[in-house]
């Protein structure tokens, strides 16, 4: 299960929880910072990490007063240092500095760096037994067995921040896992839920990022449009909750009110409901094991009285099939899936390939590269690099488009 039996360092001796936010200027990170700011009596910031948005990072640092602010892109180090001059806040840059920030003693770490780049800092936080609020599903997809082994070995606490896995976490009883019949992940269906394949072939990045319910970053918005996001979440749920692929189902739920469900063997189905606001699952993790108030709108069941559910269409959205196939193949297959998808999504956002070309790049990568065993982090890095190289060459050669 996700949570360790006896989590370490839930708060400091003064009752204040020290926190680090990895990926602080992204969608999840910005919402996390907003909640931390709302409770200055509960939280003290140790480190803030961003990829390259120095202006936003410096603004957050001036408000939260962390020990250090880190920009992953070393080219922006001078700008960050200048922006923090006279504040007493240390500035750092580069991948090693990101990992060092995760290693700093903080009770709670938000792991919100997008993509495989978040793996090493997430592992670093887990290895010192921190509470890790986990918003980076790609880490579990790339290296789920390795990460979960480190969580168990070091007594870390892993709390899901994806709305679906947070929902399951809130209604899943780990003491009665044999009584769980299945997990049901809900999906909005994204902006292309009713589109034909022909229409999707001409979709623009702007259309793919226009999610009907959620406000998210570009990459996860495209993944939602292709339903690859839900495929990655199936793999994530297997690792987080110890459930096999055959006991994890997906239902399309256009209203995004029921965030996911757990069905028990007696026929009972427990669900978590709420408005589509990422601040809610973030607050669940930030306050755990307590609850903290959020400023978002409350669910009005009368106005939301119509709740619809439908099966996903595997012909229009083959990403679900590809993700399940990678999970069943095991070894490096999920790592290849994730890396190829990241490359293809970026190429689509840059208008170098079409929307349906994303799945073609991913499928070809899975079919062409070996699904080797992953015994350590070096194996993960090798598989990830091989998949990125293959997918990038496919995009560059125009073989990803049709």
UniProtKB/Swiss-Prot annotation:
Protein name as annotated: 1-deoxy-D-xylulose 5-phosphate reductoisomerase
Instruction: Summarize where 1-deoxy-D-xylulose 5-phosphate binds, as residue positions.
Output: 137, 163-164, 188, 211, 224, 229-230, 233
Organism, scientific name: Rhodospirillum centenum (strain ATCC 51521 / SW)
**Which domain of life does the protein's organism represent?**
Bacteria
For the ligand (Mn(2+)), the binding residues are 162, 164, 233
User: Record's family?
Assistant: Belongs to the DXR family.
Q: What does this protein do?
A: Catalyzes the NADPH-dependent rearrangement and reduction of 1-deoxy-D-xylulose-5-phosphate (DXP) to 2-C-methyl-D-erythritol 4-phosphate (MEP).
Question: Which Pfam families is this protein grouped with?
Answer: DXP_redisom_C, DXP_reductoisom, DXPR_C
Q: In which pathway does it act?
A: Isoprenoid biosynthesis; isopentenyl diphosphate biosynthesis via DXP pathway; isopentenyl diphosphate from 1-deoxy-D-xylulose 5-phosphate: step 1/6
Give the required cofactors: Mg(2+); Mn(2+)
Specify which residues bind NADPH according to the UniProt entry for this protein.
25-28, 52-53, 136, 138, 217
Keywords carried by this UniProt record: Isoprene biosynthesis, Manganese, Metal-binding, NADP, Oxidoreductase
Q: What class of enzyme is it?
A: oxidoreductase
